Amino acid sequence: MFSNKPSVNILTSLLVAHGVKHAVVCPGSRNAPIVHNLNECPPITCYPITDERSAGFFALGIAQATDEPVVVCVTSGTALLNLAPAVAEAHYQHQSLIVVSADRPAEWIDQLDGQTLQQPGALAPWMKKTVTLPDLSPLTSHYSPLTSHLSPLPWHCNRLVNEALIEATDDTHPCVHINVPLNEPLFDFTVETLPEERVIRRYAPATDYSCLPQQLLDDLQSAKRPLIVFGQLSPRRFHYEGIDHLFSHIIVLHEALAPFTSVSPFEEVLTPHSSHLSSLTPDFILYVGDAIVSKRLKHFLREAEDAHTWRISLTGEVEDTFQNLRGLVVGDAEAILQALDSKFSPHIPHLSPHAVNYRRQWLQLLSDARQQLDNTPLTFSEEGAVRLLEQQLSSLISPHTSHLSPHSSHLIPLSVHYANSTAIRLANRYAKGHPVWCNRGTNGIEGSLSTAAGFAAAVLSPHPSHPSPLIFCVIGDLSFFYDQNALWNTILPRLNLRILLLNNGHGAIFDHLQGLGQSAAHPALVAGAHHTTAEGICQQCGVSRQVATDLEQLQKGILWLADAETRGPRLLEVML
């Protein structure tokens, strides 16, 4: 029988799953549920040591003898601090200790309660990873992995333990700290079996990307509904050459921030009331790149609870965006996909008919969505402005200049920076044929215009006779005025920076938040309503400016803005 504490059972299950075999345990009441569970697990041998200072070094000796990570479990308070000498020594010897400390509930820290101190980070200088598990006590009576989707807390707990144990079992043998806050009562041992928890594995094939994990290949080949998803990825670092088999047989969803020459209009496919959602739900997901803009796509993929999800990551960090991550392959995305393509191609004749039909269904729905967008009447609106700009840019782009050549270091002749919120979401509908840049790492309001200006400065031609590339920035009013000092510099007059300013007098993104419209604070206090224009800013900074107040002016203004025969900064302000 095991403890009734869900966090303790998740921890115990994952310790066993990650192959931990040795645990040094110290006496105490707060850590008793953890010690009890460790003792109940046949794969784990427990060694009782009373003095925590000695226990840490005892665990170090086991790690030296076995070359395996070793748990050392202590109660709350200064018991944790007594491990510092041993942990420091283990750190410099590259011996992995998994420090598991019980803790009091967060609300009782620094409240003069017994055996309480700030435990998270107490051993941070010698720890590769420190995590504090969430309080799962509200779920004590009914937790199981089958019901974990009802609350984000079990997923969070599972992910944190996986993160720590992935590091602890790494070839570099670091130390990690797992802090476990526990509420009373502590001594209820009535759970018959440990939960079968999701295990996340990390694979680092170093430079030999041909040695991909077999499980990844097996999951892909056996999938009936395989899906590849691309997030933000620099076009300078990915050219999708040598990946023809994968991309020709597996459906790929991507936004404007991915290094492709068009976008997938999946937002229009994944509408809440779509009758296709259940048949489109993938059973295999390969996630490449960084941030994804679409909330709808993220929600859709989080609903695929049983999907075998793999992530290609340059850093190796556990980024469980869809809450169903199983495997993490560390390295260069293009090289890994090329290796996967090579291993996948012999199995194409044996691809499941379900997988073939799944791709065909997606392609048809995406084609219908694109046709619907293209047939929508053009209006004087934010959407109309972006649509007209992208149409005009298409006429400026040749097949030879639409993306970076992987075999040269030439600067691209045209790039478009989209600010966050409404602007980048419109790019996901209409951008095509050119790289799209956006500060999506943190998704902040600040810096979009400054980033575009810096980009324009970096690609400025050193020869007056050679025209510099056109660099566009599509930006909303709040983001523009917030970052207006991007235009306050001496190099600006030389930049071919072209700004499409969508000025609707407030943050339009707030209009789409359900329920916010009922608040009296919405227009002025939340959405930042204003009556400001860019006229004065353009005058003082030497930026040519035109204004569009109707569709005809907008059409003429876009032609003026995208005129490649002229030089210098220009701004088209669309007054909506």
Feature names for model-found ranges:
Residues N158-E163, E167-S222:
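Conformationally flexible catalytic loops at phosphate/diphosphate-handling active centers
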